A protein has these predicted regions:
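N-terminal, positively charged nucleic-acid-binding surface of large information/translation enzymes
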Residues: 1-258, 330-343, 348-363, 390-432, ...
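Structured ligand/cofactor/substrate-binding pocket environments in proteins
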Residues: 60-72, 79, 88-89, 155-158, ...
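Acidic, turn-prone loop/beta-hairpin segments
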Residues: 89, 179, 183, 189-195, ...
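Core structural elements
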Residues: 135, 158, 463, 656-669, ...
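Residues immediately within or flanking Cys/His clusters that coordinate Zn2+
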Residues: 179, 403, 477, 520, ...
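Short cysteine-rich clusters marking metal-coordination/redox-active sites
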Residues: 182, 406, 480, 523-526, ...
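Cys/His-coordinated zinc-binding microdomains
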Residues: 186, 468, 484, 527, ...
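C-terminal accessory/binding modules appended to enzymatic or scaffolding proteins
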Residues: 311-313, 884-917
Length: 925
């Protein structure tokens, strides 16, 4: 008997074997070998979105990096030169916050900027090494010894090169407008740095008394009020206007001698909530209902500061579903308010809150007045009580609503009008061009992601790119010490670029401007030569967003635009967008040809992972206990285009799937290792047995599906095609049917060599199709494989992509025979199960099948591509006749049971010395 035999272990022992294999890859520079093998070929560049250098890797990191590695390994096998340069995002408030925690706030505030930056640098580098080890352990190939870091000198310089390119196009300007402000971190924030979560806030309705009466109410005896609604009482001290909905109808409701103006559609609901009777003011016998325009430019008393007046405006953003249909405007604390007031010529913007979120001290408008020195949150109840005492508070209640929070410290943020640097979205057409790139020149996976980022670009405000922190790349602006003029021009920018290339951005905080500006150290306004370097730094999204310049353009092994970016879906408003805007702004086109976005990792119940819930899956721990290939297989199996779930139960199921793949590879090796070499023992396709031709046709179809799935970044489609093929078609059907030939035929016979040829094709295909997923396991199998099955290579990463001996079109010609054979097999299997259940037969080889099949099926099953059905169904004989409908009958097979192959044959006992075996087995012996 040709019993299966291989040295490839049944038990994987991944947690112990993988680290040894990883060391071998590193010692023998496998990544460099792959680059060398494909050197000079067309390049494929997946540009790595830099993870933040803050703490060990988590399961989201693992999904991200493994996905990238699967893509890269696929294109490597396709013959492309695939340089992969991993990177890290090193600047920003989170690292600075960690340093502040370590030093303590008091000591931190006393520490020099240069020292803080030194400590931040140290923290980032230490965490990079921690994360790098985690990523390498996952089996990710790349230039790990030469990654890109956003703290490198050339990256600092690239920041300013892109800044200059956009500054020269008048895309960058300095302005005074409301921006998200974190009073805890003392810095402006961009929209991408904002997270929304539920917050309970005071909800108040307040009357603002008009100083003149609107048309139609001139004869009303009592005061006339606007009733406004707000959830931020702390903004009322800076109120400068109220806004009504253009074209909407407003009604005046009479209450205790006052006319209270509200949106007509909301007034009945409001009156009920206030405990008022809904009694409209009557004018000429009719309820006083007028359009919003009636109140345009009507003035009212500022509710906090006596002698100060506000004005009524019209604004489209006013909602008509909640509140009163009238909102108060504090242009220093809201973007909509700011633009509504600006449109009406209100340019003297009130901003009574300092960097710490506290009201300035003073008594006049523009300070905190009665609330001087109070934090905005602290002031809320005091302001409410103040309004109550004045008799202007109509109603107070609590409301839970979505509110913006700082992405790092998690504290609620506020809007503050401050002097900041902005990228204009419209002045030079950046919004339009970026939107065009999204729609026309970039492929998005999934396709609907184009709509998401397109809408974000369409709706986003100007980009606030300045931050008031220490750890980042400085905005290259100066202030003249003599006249206060801001100084920035091509000469100063070129000098800064040169400085950063040579010394990095730390030099901004240590070197005097005159030491490197030379003749550029002059104020164009007053001619003074005393320039002071400003302290604002660039938004970290700018910093990472120019990596296309600092990495893809600067590094000769890469290309710009990159072939693909892949990150989480949150990067539509983060790195995808900052990269898009800087690249389009500087060069007029997107930095990527395709973008793949992924969802978030959740637990098995669809919840976010947190230590408090005890549902965190640590990839390092999984590697130590189960192996990295289990995580890799999980990543391949789930649809990462949306949120995905992972827990210990899911990983256990993944381990079961892993065993299916491993056992299949092991079975194939057990019939090939030391027994078969395709280059000397292989059988040409034309000479294969019919069943083997059928399997080659089927593997060709599966291979085409897997190829298309990988090329389309649809990993679960590749996984599902392979899993179903291995489990349903190979293990349960073909390999089972083949065992008779493999075990019992002569070792060198055509029948056995035909079977082994197909096993070699299957092995070659699976090794390549699984290599991007089960990188460690496939590499392990290389040592046991026939050399011709693995391109005579030692490492799996060096394999070329599988090429079937026939085309897909040729394979499709076998589809009818396969479908007919499988349809009849189902009927035969049921008949066998029925017979077993009543004890008629115990083994399928005891059976002879008599089947009646329709004409079309009969033609397929007896035609030139027909297979040996007895072998396929593992029975001793199959007799086919043509009829109207499919039916199957089984009976006892003719002859006797061969003791060697267990088939029933009439030739058993015909050969001397072999009384109990059939002719085929006697010949084999």
């Amino acid at each position: 008997m040709n019993l299966p035999k291989t040295g490839f272990p049944m038990r994987a022992g991944l947690s112990k074997s993988e680290p040894k294999r990883l060391k071998d890859w590193q010692d023998n520079k496998v990544y460099e070998q792959v680059l060398k093998k494909n050197e000079g070929h067309k390049k494929f560049v997946l540009h790595d979105g830099p993870p933040y250098a803050n703490g060990p890797i988590h399961i989201g990191h693992a999904m991200n990096k493994i996905s990238k590695d699967m893509i890269n390994r696929y294109w490597m096998m396709q013959g492309y030169e695939v340089p992969y340069v991993p990177g890290w995002d090193c600047h920003g408030q989170p690292i600075e916050h960690k340093v502040e925690e370590k030093l303590g706030t008091e000591k931190f505030n006393q520490t020099s900027t240069a020292k803080i930056r030194e400590l931040c640098n140290k923290f980032a580098v230490e965490n990079i090494e921690l994360q790098k080890a985690g990523f390498r352990r996952l089996g990710v190939l790349g230039d790990w010894d030469n990654p890109y870091l956003t703290l490198y000198h050339q990256h600092d310089a690239a920041d300013i090169e892109v800044f200059k390119a956009m500054f020269d196009k008048a895309m960058i300007y300095r302005g005074h407008k409301p921006v998200h402000w974190c009073k805890h971190c003392h810095t402006a924030l961009a929209e991408a740095e904002i997270e929304y979560s539920d917050e309970t806030s005071p909800s108040i309705f307040v009357r603002f008394e008009m100083t003149s009466k609107p048309a139609g109410l001139e004869n009303f005896d009592g005061p006339v009020d606007f009733i406004i609604w707000t959830t931020t009482p702390w903004t009322i001290p800076s109120d400068q206007a109220v806004s009504l909905k253009p074209g909407a109808a407003y009604v005046a409701v009479e209450h205790e001698g006052r006319a209270e103006v509200m949106l007509e559609d909301l007034a009945p609901k409001c009156c009920e909530e206030f405990g008022w009777e809904y009694t409209p003011v009557m004018v000429d016998g009719k309820p006083y209902v007028v359009p919003a325009e009636t109140f345009h430019h009507i003035h009212y008393k500022q509710p906090i500061f006596d002698g100060v007046e506000g004005v009524a405006l019209l604004a489209d953003y006013v909602g008509v579903d909640d509140g009163t249909g009238i909102v108060h405007n504090s242009p220093g604390h809201g973007v909509d308010d700011y633009f509504a007031c600006l449109k009406e010529g209100i340019t003297d913007i009130c901003m009574p809150v300092d960097d710490d979120g506290k009201f300035y001290t003073g008594e006049e408008f523009g300070t905190g007045g009665p609330f001087s020195g109070m934090d905005t949150d602290e002031a809320n109840p005091h302001i409410i009580e103040f309004l109550r005492e004045r008799g202007t508070l109509v109603l107070e209640k609590k409301i839970t609503h979505s509110y913006p929070h700082c992405w790092r410290c998690k504290h609620p943020v506020l809007f503050r009008a401050t002097d900041q640097w902005f990228v204009s979205m419209d002045k030079t057409g950046l919004r339009e061009q970026a939107g065009k790139e999204v729609r026309e020149n970039v492929k998005w996976y999934p396709a609907h992601a184009a709509n998401r980022i397109g809408a974000m670009v369409e709706q986003r405000p100007d980009w606030c790119i300045s931050r008031q922190r220490n750890w980042g790349v400085p905005i290259p602006s100066y202030t003249c010490a003599d006249c206060g003029e801001k100084v920035m021009n091509d000469a100063t920018l070129d000098a800064v670029i040169k400085l950063f290339h040579e010394k990095g951005s730390d030099a901004w905080f240590t070197d005097a401007p005159e030491s490197y500006l030379g003749e550029a150290c002059v104020c164009p306004k007053c001619g003074g030569h005393h320039l002071k370097a400003d302290k604002d730094i660039l938004d970290v999204w700018w910093d990472s967003g120019v990596s296309w310049k600092a990495v893809c353009e600067y590094r000769p092994e890469l290309e710009y635009p990159a072939d693909v970016y892949l990150e989480g879906s949150d990067q539509h408003r983060g790195w995808f967008q900052s990269s898009l805007l800087t690249s389009v702004g500087a060069n007029g086109h997107a930095p990527y040809k395709a973008v793949v976005s992924q969802g978030f990792t959740l637990d098995g119940q669809g919840r976010k992972m947190s230590k408090s819930l005890g549902n965190v899956i640590d990839p390092n721990k999984v590697c130590d206990e189960m192996g990295a290939d289990i995580i890799r297989l999980w990543v391949a199996s789930v649809d990462t285009s949306s949120d995905v779930s992972i827990d210990h139960e899911i990983l256990a199921r993944t381990s079961d799937a892993y065993r299916r793949f491993r056992n299949t590879l092991r079975f194939l090796l057990s019939e090939l290792e030391g027994q078969f070499e395709p280059e000397t023992d292989g059988v040409a396709f034309a000479d294969l047995l019919p069943l083997d031709k059928l399997m080659v046709a089927r593997l060709t179809q599966v291979q085409a599906e897997v190829d298309d799935a990988y090329a389309s970044y649809e990993f679960p489609r590749a996984y599902r095609a392979l899993y179903d093929f291995v489990v349903t078609e190979l293990s349960n059907v073909y390999l089972d049917a083949l065992k008779d030939r493999l075990y019992c035929d002569k070792p060198g016979s055509l029948e056995r060599r035909s079977a082994q040829t197909v096993l070699a094709e299957l092995f070659s295909m699976l090794m390549r199709d699984l290599q991007p997923i089960l990188s460690y396991t496939v590499d392990e199998a290389m040592a046991y494989a026939p050399a011709g099955c693995v391109d005579h290579q030692k490492y799996a990463a060096l394999l070329d992509w599988y090429k079937s001996p026939i085309t897909v079109d040729e394979a499709n010609e076998f589809e009818g025979v396969l479908e007919a054979s499988l349809e009849l097999r189902s009927a035969v299997t049921k008949a066998l199960e029925d017979a077993r259940s009543v004890g008629t037969f115990t083994k399928s080889q005891q059976v002879r099948v008599k089947a009646v099949v329709p004409a079309e099926m009969y033609a397929l099953l007896t035609g030139d591509k027909a297979v040996d059905l007895a072998e396929f169904y593992i029975v001793s004989d199959v007799e086919l006749t043509q009829g109207e409908e499919l039916s199957v009958a089984i009976e006892a097979a003719e002859g006797e049971c061969c003791d060697r192959c267990w088939n029933y044959r009439t030739t058993v006992g015909e050969y001397n010395g072999h009384a109990h075996i059939c002719k085929r087995c006697a010949d084999a012996l």
